[in-house]
Amino acid sequence: MKISYNWLKKFIKVNQSPEETGELLTDLGLEIEGIEAFTSVPGGLEGIVVGHVLECIQHPDADRLKLTKVDVGNGTPLQIVCGAPNVAVGQKVPVATIGTTLYDADKNPWTIKKGKIRGEESQGMICAEDELHIGTSHDGIMVLDAQLKPGTLFSEVIGIENDHIFEIGLTPNRADAMSHWGVARDLRAGLLQNGVSLELITPSTSSFHVNNRSLKIDVSVENNELAPRYCGVTIKNLKVAASPTWLQNRLKSIGLSPINNVVDITNYILHELGQPLHAFDASKINGGKVIVKTLPEGTLFTTLDGVERKLDKEDLMICDTEKPMCIAGVFGGIDSGVTETTTSIFLESAYFNPISVRKTAKRHGLNTDASFRFERGIDPNITEYALMVAAIMMEEIAGGEISSDVVDIYPKKIEDHQVFLSYENTARLIGEEIPKETIKQILTSLEIKINNVTETGIGITIPAYRNDVTREADVIEEVLRVYGYNRIKTSTKLNASMASVKRIEDYKVQDKVGGQLTALGFHEMLNNSLTNEAYYKHTQTLRPEHSVKMLNPLSKDLEILRQSMLFGGLESLAFNANRRIENIKLFEFGKTYHQFPNNREEHKHLSLIVSGNKTTDTWAFPSQKTSFFYLKGVVQSILQGLGISGYVESDVKNDIFSEGILLQKNKKLLVEFGIVSKKIAKHFSIETELLYADFHWDQVLQELTGNNVQVTNIPKFPKVKRDFALLLDDEVRFENLKLAALQTEKHLLKEVSLFDVYTGKNLPKGKKSYALSFTIQDENKTLTDKQIDKIMAKLQQTFEKEFGATLR
């Protein structure tokens, strides 16, 4: 945000330099990102003087050029070749002398040099308005007041303004500081803390009066929730023209281009007081009535930029009896604005609902100075005041007459809010005690009203324009920023408490697992958390009512927050597959979002998605396709790398997978993985087999919290391996056999592995054969055959009892 130093001095007569003022504003929380020197005319018109045309004859070799003699006050007239049709003897004109730097339309500099034009020497240049950047006319040279003396500096004639412009990095909560008035309020409070007491000077409305009541326009507000306050007044017999130089300079200094006096005044009030205004051509208001209302969905409306827009049923509009004229608080319409022929206006000043304006602006892709302020919340109680200040300026600058009483529709006043400020809490949060009188002085300087003072604190009323100050902590922050962060002493003692609970740093675990997956040939992806609701029509597992929906989605593809990481992964896979990248292994860390009747939840996940071959063809080895068991191995290696074991395996029972497995520990789901349903894959035009794993990362991290690293000696005594084959039912899983075996012999059985699976001939229907290997070891002695046989017998008994297994 740009703030003019000269403009600030209209409110508060500071004697500090711009640099000192910038430092103070930064200390107050209005960070100055830069200070730039500003001159209202490029180059400051240096080298431009008033000249007196003594002679003007036809150029001997050019029909459209004149040869002139011009007195520039130094005693020796200059010969200047001029192409302007209006140059004549006796005129006073601006002359750019040799060595003067001028600027082209793109502000690029060029220098006046002595030279010849069609054989005749030219010792300078007689200038037009646009060549000096003080106007837009290029019809001819400027003709000045005949009373001016030759040699007078042209900058003195025009009135150049030199200024310094602050670039403020305004935080979103400081809506009250989005104007010169707002910044001046803070500056005054800061100066007061530095022992400088200055008056805050605000524009007076004492001269406001109604000239006549000949142009009454009725106002009706149909939606007071979206337009809590609406004011207006009519002004007639005004003349739309260029603004005076001082007003143009004010706007130029903050980067605005002057348009005409009426529009310039509304922009001036916006940046001076923070109140957006809008001027309607009164002759274009049908029915003599302004109606503030919403319109049916799909109503067409053409804005000032010539774009036809379809309105939403929630867009608040300013209408007459026949048509919409303006999107409230955002942008005007093409058919109701002020033009050069306008002689009467209806001037609007309002307070619109910030949320409504923000939604409308986003919906239509519009971002204006007005919407920027309305979205953040302006002062609802200066609406009429700002309107009156603007009306007075319309009288003085545009020659208008105030032709109606001010209409002010404000059915429910937005009240100031009250807070009790505790001295004890203030000292506790700041870290030291600030004198009570200093606290009261700071509050008063911030226009916070003191209602009552007790031994324990102060009862205060906070003005409505400070919508960011609603709690005691907010008030304490205000006191601290004005008192000065730099004045708070650093304590010589640092007190801290240390948690005894083992802390798992998520990012470190993610980094470890990400490195492991990268080593396995995976690539990390990062998908948008917003996704298309239509994806969820292909599964009954993820219910539409559990989706967190966006109130104002940018497109159909971004209308809900994802419940699953799957669909983003499939989008990425399909994108790559369409570019002939066939062997794909991807992973992503992210969050899913879930809507429940009484709350919303976020959960962390790690997703893996695999398609194609796990290896490529080489001269030594052919490529190998990925498989369910390849993905299972990746999942198990991740869990093993994290030190997680003892999980239980079971079948996935949802329609996301055509075949899949759940891994649980202590009845908490760690991961689910398997082959993605063809119905879902087909929606993304993927024909190959897709493998997907979904780690419930919150649960994985929770398991890590309880894991302790144990260090053991290298065993001195040998391991013993024994095998046997079991005849089992088809539904029995190896993981369940392994878990049962380890629970049967907890001390000596170190490892159980599956080394052969057989199904087919010579086996009963519904049966399969598993060949298992058992590693047995005693760390304190060598095992005897008798001890080993006893262990194997116990294992056989467990398998027979729990799984109905028989030895083959």
List the predicted regions and their residue ranges.
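Phosphate-backbone binding interfaces of nucleic-acid-interacting proteins
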Residues: M1-N211, F346, G365, D369, ...
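A carboxyl-terminal module marker
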Residues: K2, S445-I448, D468, E472, ...
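Short, hydrophobic beta-strand segments
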Residues: K2-W7, N162-T171, P228-K236, D369-R376, ...
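Glycine/proline-enriched, intrinsically flexible loops and inter-domain linkers
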Residues: Y5, E23, D27-L28, S40, ...
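Conserved mixed alpha/beta core segments that line enzyme active sites in large multi-domain catalysts
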Residues: V49-Q79, N260, T266-D335
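Mobile "lid/hinge" segments at catalytic clefts and subdomain interfaces of large enzymes
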Residues: R118-E131, S137-V143, F154-H164, I291, ...
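Terminal amphipathic helices with adjacent charged low-complexity linkers/tails
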Residues: L187, L191-V221, A398-T426, E432-E433, ...
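Extended, well-folded interaction surfaces typified by the phenylalanyl-tRNA synthetase beta subunit core
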Residues: V419-Y423, A427-E582, T775-Q777, Q787-R808
